[in-house]
Amino acid sequence: MNKIEEKKRQERAEHLLEKCREVLRSEKIPVSEGIIGLKINDGIRSRFGSCRKVQGVKKMNPEFEIEISGRMMNADDRAIETVLLHELIHTCHGCMNHGKRWRQYAMRLNQKYGYEIKATSGYKAFGLEDPGSREQVRYRIVCVNCGMEFTRKRRCPIVVNTDRYRCGKCGGRLEIR
């Protein structure tokens, strides 16, 4: 990606962040004014975004850094807004986890604006391809009794020592196919 594309991507993300902050303010949700940066991280593999409290900052006026996955930038604006709102809610006092207050704020936005802000979401929810779906299934473990199938992408204890395990559904013997 060249510098011009990176700049456009960053500008888009910052524009959407500001739009989300306005939505939160209009709903009287006490979003922090101490957001010091929005970073697009192409290395994130296991999440869509994060909100980090900057260390060493006073407790009265904490500062936060918001990070969004580079993959999310391939989604539509609505999906990006959903992730940014999720992270912005974390900047509210008492909302660093997905506790009661966080859920109340998310529910309020979901009901009024039709967002789908959740504690966790999958790639399908945002119309993105799951990067893990490209990996081939290397092991198929099948119950001889009921036919239940388990798949594994990596060599693991159940693959190495299949005879030590039983089917969780019926207790039958397992075999690799």
Regions found by a protein language model. Give the residues of each.
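Active-site-proximal or metal-binding-adjacent scaffold patches in catalytic folds
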Residues: 1-82, 91-177
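Walker B catalytic acidic pair
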Residues: 87
